[in-house]
Structure formats: C-alpha cells, structure tokens
Amino acid sequence: MGRFSRSWDLVEQSFAILWADKQLMFFPVLSGISCVIVTLLLGVSGLAIFLPAIRAAGITAQNFPHFAKSPEFAGAMFVFYLANYFVIVFFNVALVGVANSRLTGGNWTFDQGLQLAWTRKWVILQWAFVAATVGMVLRALSERAGFIGRMVIGIIGVAWNIACYFVVPVLAFEDVSPGAALYRSAELFTETWGERVVGGFSLGLVFFVLMIPGFALWFAAVRLWGAAGAVAGGVVMGAYMLLLSVMSSAVQGIFNAALYRYACDKEVPAGFSRDLIQGAWAPKD
C-alpha cells in the first residue's frame, strides 16, 4: 500500500469516529479562537509596553531587524510562544481525552474533556514552557547557522517532534511531570516502532489534496463572474479551508489517541485496521 493510500485510509477511519462524535470538532474551534484572542491581547499589550521605547530609540522598518534580535523582543516572543503553546496543548489534551473515551467504548462529553484538561493545567503550563524554550532555541540557532548547520538543526527538530509525539496523551492520562512525559513519550514510541523510523502516513498530504477543490472553485468563480466571483468565491473558499483545518486538527487528535492506545496496550482500537496502525511508522532502512 502506498503512502498516500495508507494516509487516506487512516483519515477515513479517523473521520468515521469524528462523524460519530462531532463534538470533537469544538476543541480545535475553541483552540483557534483562543489563540486569536491571546495573540490580540499580547499584541496590544506589547505595543503599549514597547511603543514608547521604539519611538524613543528611533526604530523604523529599516532598522527593525536589529531590534528583533534584542533581549526585549526575544522575551516578548517567548511569552507569545508560551501562551499559544499552552492554549493549543490544553485543548489537545481535552480532545484526546474525549477521543480516547470513544475508542475505549466510553461516552465522555465535551465538558468532561475540558475538565480533564483543567485538572492538568499546571503540568500543561510547565510543558508549554519547555516546548516554547526548545522552539525559541532551535529558531535562534537556525537563524545563525549556515546551510549545514540548518540541516543539522532540522534533523534535531524532527527527532524532537518524534520524541514528543505522545506527550499530549501522556499528559492527559498519566500523572507525570513534563520531563517524565517526554521520556515516557519517547519510550512508548521506540518500544513500539523502533528508534530509526520513517513515517508511513501523512495526514497533512491528504488534507492538502482536499484543499484543491477549494482553490478550483475560487478560480472558476473568478473566470465566470470576475471581481464579484472573486469575493464570493473567496468567502466560500475561506469557509471551506476553515472547515478542513478544524477537521484536520480533530482527525490528528483522534489518530494520536489511537496510536497511544496501541502503544500502551498493543491492541488496535475499534474502528482502525491492524495493518494501518502497525505500519503508521516503519523501520528506516
């Protein structure tokens, strides 16, 4: 089975669970809205704090890149990363909690998912601090490195993402610290699929293909109705893309919960095929 075919089947199986429990889509919606609100609040606060200093220092668009390397700007960006990481992980924990309930025959409600995330809020905040720190460090190193250095940092980033793959469900279901969650996540992954692996699926690729009809609709509207079609088609395409984004986030959360259950219990959750779950990651030749 090819990588795209495998990915398509995984999306279908995950979507079947989403279709049976549509409340799962509310978590990505709330996550997105919360991130927008947090970004706006931080942006307004940042302007209020830094604008007088920016004016006093005579910072313009031409010399802003120099200001962007200052400790003050780095601190502001860290707060931005921290806040958004917290929001994203918080709602992902809630999503994985409800998805896990569905996979194991339970019937958790939306509120129960939020309650789970709320009980984990402090460890989620601690993990957000760790993730924001690593993200900032990798970003800073990448900006200062040459071509080879960026390749090495990219490899480190991939290894970090794999090690973190099960951090969200571990935070949700196991009473551990952020460091222990990272260790447990990496342990589950390597014990189940090995240390050197390649992805046997790409949910992002499937949703990229699903985006094509949205662009096609917009181009068709422009060709048929000109400027009016561009506006109307843009509205429809935007709504379609938002729906795909919500569905993509929900499907990824469901699949993450399914793989976590398999990694813990070595039993394939109901609704998923054994071959697809076992082959989600393959040993690297």
Provide a role label for each language-model segment.
Residues 1-285:
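Hydrophobic alpha-helical membrane segments
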